[in-house]
């Protein structure tokens, strides 16, 4: 009996080792789980479900094979793949969830999020995030020619890398006040999120009672998986080879 959580795999054609590691995880480690949650940034970027990139089909089929074995699959959008839609989710056998969302995990209410909502000190990014949530803008972008979307995504990734190189680590991390607010708002004592690439389990006090925040790791150097069982949460690392 276990529920699995992963995030920030950042799959792309340039890193076939990460794709192979994920496919291996889905085929050999995830079967038999009570559920698998992917908390965003499964892909390095996503410009629409109509992108014919063969990587997308390979990954969707690997998830679908797990779904067909009876493992429920859930996905929360990240800041890199916020345009991932129902067509891909249907092929992969996934259910799309909102951010944040609350689940019942072995009798405990847990709030899930990709995590970028919690980085409130990064005001520039939060402004950009609000813009990307505009439905009319998404509708317009997805109707651009595929080549145009690819060019825009490439330019935006370059700008993001340049900006992040000059930001402090504090600005790009979550703020305690935002964590506390989200927990209170959803009446939870536990939170699971990704985005910051700083895997850890943080225990703290919230309104005089114990609370826990679990941060998932990325898959750049090794796979990072959170394994939850009744009364237990454990972060594990998996080799990419």
UniProtKB/Swiss-Prot annotation:
Gene3D superfamilies: 3.60.21.10. It comes from the Bacteria. Its cofactor is Mn(2+). Its EC number is 3.6.1.54. GO terms for biological process: lipid A biosynthetic process. CDD domains: MPP_YbbF-LpxH (cd07398). The keyword Magnesium does not apply. Mn(2+) 1 binds at residues 8, 10, 41, 197. Binds 2 Mn(2+) ions per subunit in a binuclear metal center. This is UDP-2,3-diacylglucosamine hydrolase. Hydrolyzes the pyrophosphate bond of UDP-2,3-diacylglucosamine to yield 2,3-diacylglucosamine 1-phosphate (lipid X) and UMP by catalyzing the attack of water at the alpha-P atom. Involved in the biosynthesis of lipid A, a phosphorylated glycolipid that anchors the lipopolysaccharide to the outer membrane of the cell. It is an enzyme of class 3 (hydrolase). NCBIfam families: lipid_A_lpxH (TIGR01854), PRK05340.1 (NF003743). It holds the Pfam family Metallophos. Pathway: Glycolipid biosynthesis; lipid IV(A) biosynthesis; lipid IV(A) from (3R)-3-hydroxytetradecanoyl-[acyl-carrier-protein] and UDP-N-acetyl-alpha-D-glucosamine: step 4/6. One of its GO terms (molecular function) is manganese ion binding.
